[in-house]
Amino acid sequence: INDDFLKLDMTEINSSTFNEKFDFIISKRAIQNVLDTQLQINTIENLGNFLDDNGFMVCVESSKNGQENINKERIKFGLEEIMPPYHNLFFDDNVITNYSFKNVRLVETIPFASDFYFITRLVYSRYAKEYLNEKPNYDHPLEKIALSMTGESYTKRFSQIKTYIFKKK
């Protein structure tokens, strides 16, 4: 079992970076820091080169579409839009879903944080503004309730963070 952990610039990975193939490659909110869509695609392609024949790449990244859905609802209720950090380019689900990757295929997208974002960015934000006359507070009980609901997916379209699972072709 190869259980080495490496810290590299993912945009500079090429065919000579590794001498071996991997069962799993995991990215957690890293590819979203690549600020060009094509370079994000290239990064997924390049990482996919290093998966073994039955390998999986698990990417937990922010979703532009989930963020847009949250903001559409926030605007309806007079809440400010939430802008992504300047150092992130959230995944465009349409691009990721429809792109013809050469060596991996997207097998599943899991919107595991939908309920959390729905409650904290919409329900609680409205409650704080309309009834408490205060800004949302991460220590509020509704934040804790929302965290306990993560994974239930009552509200799939509001997941700002999703898991994208790719399998070696």
Model-inferred region functions:
Residues N46-D53:
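Conserved helix-to-beta-strand junction in the class I
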Residues P85-T109:
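Short alpha-helix
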Residues I26:
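A conserved beta-strand element that flanks and buttresses the S-adenosyl-L-methionine
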Residues I1-S15:
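Conserved SAM-binding strand-loop segment of SAM-dependent methyltransferases
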Residues N33-N46:
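A short, conserved alpha-helix within the catalytic core of class I
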Residues K135-K169:
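C-terminal lobe and adjacent flexible extensions of AdoMet/dcAdoMet transferase-like proteins
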Residues V104-H140, F158:
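Conserved catalytic loop of SAM-dependent methyltransferase domains
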Residues F56-E81:
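Conserved class I S-adenosyl-L-methionine
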